[in-house]
Amino acid sequence: HVEVSAKKNGFDWEPVMRAIIQIESKGNPAAVNGPYVGVLQISPVLVKECNNILRSTGSTKRYSLSDRFNATKSKEMFVIIQGFYNPLNSIEKAIRLWSGGIRYNVAKTQAYLSKVLRHMSN
C-alpha cells in the first residue's frame, strides 16, 4: 500500500511541490510543454513508472495520462516517485530527480535546484 498524501513517512512534500509547481506551470493544471503536462509537468514515462511502482507494491491503483491534468493526482505521483527513488526524503535529491530524471546529472540539475530552493525560501 502506497501512501499518496503529501506526507510520506511523516515527511511533508508540500513546500517542495509548491515551489516546483510555481516554476513548472505557475499553478496552471492545463499547462502543456511537449510531452510534459499539468501543474508538475509530468511525462507519459513518469505515469508509467508510477504504475509500475504501484504494481510492484501490490496496489490496484493506476494512473492514466489524463490524470496529469489533475493537480491532486499529479502530487500523488510526485510522492510515489519520491517514496520509491528517494526513500530518505532528501529535498535536494527530490528536486534533482524531478528535473533530471532517475539518473540525473548533478551539474545539469544545479540551476534548477537553486531556482526551486529560492522559491521555497520566499
Give the residues covered by each predicted segment.
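Catalytic glycan-binding domains that act on GlcNAc-containing polysaccharides
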Residues: 1-122
